[in-house]
Amino acid sequence: MDGFIVIDKPAGLTSHDIIARVRRILGQKKAGHTGTLDPFATGVLPVAMGEGTKAIPFLDEAVKEYRATMVLGAATDTQDCTGRVEKEGDWTRLSVEAVREVFGAYIGKCKQIPPMYSAVKQGGVPLYRLARKGHEVEREPRDIEIHSLIIDRMELPRIEFTVSCSRGTYVRTLAHDMGERLGCGAHLSALRRTRSGPFDLSRAVTLDELASIKEQGAVDSLLLAPNEVLGHFPEIELSDEEVRKVYCGVPPRCHGRCEESSASQNDGKKVRLVQNGKLLAVAEIGQAESGNGNKSLRLIRVFN
């Protein structure tokens, strides 16, 4: 079984728990996920199986989309509803305009300090382990990007919003930081991921639904092939001879098939090597060869 299945993760389970249950339901040994979700969060968790696991590293930069609810007036140690209230503040004098102004200030590229309750490692130790012992350490701010931040509903102290963001963005930290900026504190009370790169809720199934579909022998209807999942990479169709060479570790030549093959800006760009819709490999465009200007390709990952 090779490809991806999108699980609608329930609250209360870790992403690792989901992988263990999917393996058990499908009898699949080789499985992994892309894009960890906090235990209290729900929604899109892409699970890769078999050869699909080879595609995971190429999905790291995928844009994520979430629906979230934040509550003003209380900041917690975990920055969400599972934590202990550390600080309370008065939100009653806040205007709708002030809230909208703060939301607008976070759109674009910015720095974010990862929360103590996270899997980010410092000195080889996950921060959450230090946090559970009552330790707080300095963390380096990380570059993130908020592509869009839309208020869906505002009934203070509750604000429901939709955010589209880059990898590595902690939505609960975003809520916490906006609460600090508003001067009253805030925490996240609900978080649901609606999209992760090419995966969205329209293709998601619950664990119970997956078990039922497995009993019906229809799991293949859920599978997203690696070639579809990596559709954001340009495609190069290979001949039979080129396929044989790829499986021997020899990459094909571009021969004009790489977009703007004479442009140096394409150096390092990744492409899919396919035949008849089947993904054979992911390759990287190299520099042009001297004399003929033809670009070279370097194999990164070969799929069986």
UniProtKB/Swiss-Prot annotation:
Lineage: Bacteria, Pseudomonadati, Thermodesulfobacteriota, Desulfuromonadia, Geobacterales
Disulfide bonds: none
Name the UniProt record assigns to this protein: tRNA pseudouridine synthase B
Any single biological process term in GO: mRNA pseudouridine synthesis
Keyword match Transmembrane helix: no
EC number: 5.4.99.25
PANTHER family (UniProt xref): PSEUDOURIDYLATE SYNTHASE TRUB1, TRNA-PSEUDOURIDINE SYNTHASE
InterPro entries in UniProt: PsdUridine_synth_cat_dom_sf, PsdUridine_synth_N, tRNA_psdUridine_synth_TruB, TruB_C
Function: Responsible for synthesis of pseudouridine from uracil-55 in the psi GC loop of transfer RNAs.
Record-level Gene Ontology MF annotations: RNA binding; tRNA pseudouridine(55) synthase activity
Superkingdom per UniProt: Bacteria
Protein family according to the UniProt entry: Belongs to the pseudouridine synthase TruB family. Type 1 subfamily.
Residues forming the catalytic site: 38
Cell inner membrane found in the keyword field: no
Enzyme type, top EC level: isomerase
CDD domains membership: PseudoU_synth_EcTruB (cd02573)
Annotated source species: Geobacter metallireducens (strain ATCC 53774 / DSM 7210 / GS-15)
Keywords: Isomerase, tRNA processing
